[in-house]
UniProtKB/Swiss-Prot annotation:
Belongs to the GatB/GatE family. GatB subfamily. Its EC number is 6.3.5.-. PROSITE patterns: GATB. Heterotrimer of A, B and C subunits. Keywords: ATP-binding, Ligase, Nucleotide-binding, Protein biosynthesis. One of its GO terms (biological process) is glutaminyl-tRNAGln biosynthesis via transamidation. The lineage of its organism: Bacteria, Bacillati, Bacillota, Bacilli, Lactobacillales. This is Aspartyl/glutamyl-tRNA(Asn/Gln) amidotransferase subunit B. SUPFAM superfamilies: GatB/YqeY motif, Glutamine synthetase/guanido kinase. The gene is gatB. The keyword Transcription does not apply.
Amino acid sequence: MNFKSTIGLEVHFELKTKSKIFSPSPVTYGAEANTETNVIDWAMPGVLPRLNKDVYRLGIMVALATHSHILPVTHFDRKNYFYPDNPKAYQITQFFQPLARDGYIEVEVRGKKKRIGIHEMHIEEDAGKNTHGANGYSYVDLNRQGVPLLEVVSEPDMEDPEEAYAYLTKLRQIVQFTGASDVKMEEGSMRVDTNISIRPAGQEKLGTKVEMKNLNSFDHVRRSLAYEEKRQQQVLLSGGRVQLSTRRFDEATGKTVLERVKEGDADYRYFPEPDIAPYHIKQSWIDEIAESLPESPFERRKRYVKEYGIKEYDADVILQTKESSDFYDAAVAAGADPTLAANWLNTQVNGYLNENQVGIADIKLTPEHLAEMIKMIKDGTISSKIAKKVFKESIENGTDPKKYVEDKGMVQLSDVSVLGPMVTKVVDDNPQSVEDFKNGKDRAIGFLVGQIMKQTRGKANPKVVNQLLNKELQSR
């Protein structure tokens, strides 16, 4: 029996504001517990929320970048539930009138393009954080309480884990390039909840959905959905029923584990937030934000391919993060050849980042240093082999490439008046190689190049040496 999967995603992004959504408390990742809170975050009696309007500006940027319809009037609502990390016993969110609806993102999977709908996106406050100690006590940190979130809810348009992965990748890229969030999953500024149901192929009615919450990597999203697909298929094939439930992904086993069975969708008794007035969004403000939107990743891709002439694959690798793309643009602006800059960034720089598990913002190599090194390669000042040594020094210690090359005597020997006599002597001293060359043995010239490189301790310009050797051998 064949089955069809239906997948939906809810993605929470921490909006990059200096203070919280309803209080003046600062937002700093990694701060000591409960040091970035005040009476509003604690829900002390009589305090009132004060809206940080910058969250709307950032949210509108994402809405515009995802072709979403921005509602002219929005308001906040109370989602009622009790948990220790929620001192008010309700969360301020947008339920009835969210920020935006009916957007979409286009993805490409297995060579085919598909449009994934965005049901809505709404602004809300984050909850605090519970930590369960080994001594039997639980501790609450309210630093995260009130941090502004933008929740993007997809339509259930994805039909397999690869489509979900592609959607997440594209959504993360879009949000990051707007500057609305830094989308760092390792710091919790991007969190993913998934739901998946399966049904026999041809059946219109959707199956019973299973939720998985707070998946902390794209790989976990893909693996958990793939496992859950197979698990639900086995349940149905054995004559059982899939339970409406919440499960978690166990990274060690690669399986999902039941957390709780649900009898139905939770009733949070939503009602309008009485302490915050409805928010009117003027079209003139939307137009102003639209004009100030940064260049999108799709626009950059077109520029890289058409103006810079690099391959689409190289452009896609560069555009995986905004930091990488900004680094590349700065290197080209500093005079680097676009193709060589793309090659060095995607191979040597990314190789160093992966090996050392750091981001491009953590390295000491600057775009200007990379550009300087590439210019020296192109004008023949250094060879590609020497360039790798220069690159290692610059990326580890921030050393200026030009100064390092000069101080270490690494300048490539390209002077024909010096190399010419050396070539003539090497050819004279190796008559067998000359004979081999005349007989069509191409390896002969490689041997002669090696002799020159040996005499110059690797400093001779291979391109110039090859040109001189070919000219000399042709004359014999």
